[in-house]
Structure formats: C-alpha cells, structure tokens
Amino acid sequence: EDIGYKKDKGSLAFGKKVTLSRRPDATPNYFYELLNPQDVIKTRRFEDVDTQYDFIAKQIKKNITEDELDPDDILVIFPSVIYAKSQYQRFAQHLARYSISSMLAGVTNERDIFHIPGSISCSAIYRAKGNESPMVYIVNADCCYEGIELIKLRNTLFTAITRSRAW
C-alpha cells in the first residue's frame, strides 16, 4: 500500500496469484479530469516490427502536432536491454521520416541526461527507472510475453508502464 496499490484478492506470496488495484488517492486529479481511463493504456498487435515502429512514429507526430505535447514529454521504452540499441537505431529511422528528433538515453548523449528539450527520449528499461514522462510508448513488449524467468519479464513490463506520470 505504500506505493499506491491495494490488494483486491489473492496472496502476495511467491507463486500465488494476486490482483492489485490503484488506490484512488494515489492517482493525480488530472487523470480523472482530463483523461478517459479506458484510453490511458492501449495495446495493439502488429504484423512486423516496421509496421509497429511506423505506427508509433505517426502517433508521436500526432502527440506533438495535435495533442500539445512537447517532444521531451514523450518516452519510448525498449524492454529488452540486450537489443535496445539496435532496436532504437531502426526505430529512429522511422521517427526521422516524420522529422522527429530522438535520443537513446545514455548512449547517443551524455550518460546523466535523460531528457533533451525538443527531442523524444528513448531508453532501455533499466535506464528508464527513476525517470517519468507524461506519454510513454513501450515497443516490442512481446519480449515480455514468455520465456525464462517470466516473473522478471512481467516486472520489466510493469516498470515500463509505471514510467508514465499518468500512472
């Protein structure tokens, strides 16, 4: 409960199922005033990586031109630490087609800088910890669907989701 959640059912014991929900007092007022809760977290399935990257690049362009977000209000998270750099390089090409400036935190800029005015921030999951943005996109989240140490993969996805200030 110290981090804004309450247990609805189940047990927090290892290997047990549990259902958590956000406490109403732990959610900023603007969440209810300005946002439709059903639109806050959206999931979408893509046939291939380039289709995903192009869709997200278009959405980011819309966020900047129509939704009144500054580029540095937007964070793109790559859950796979191993592939984040190569995935970012491919994703950045899609952003460039829409004249969107970006950086991969700690790789394409100084290590201690996470946000640059006029540029969207992209990050591997561990670099994103402790940093938040009003708008967060999680790309290639399918890497958290199955595999060895599934609980760590799910925690990775949860960490990515909680990088949004709306959370």
Task: Explain the meaning of each model-derived region.
Residues 1-167:
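The feature marks helicase ATPase cores and/or their adjacent C-terminal helical subdomains
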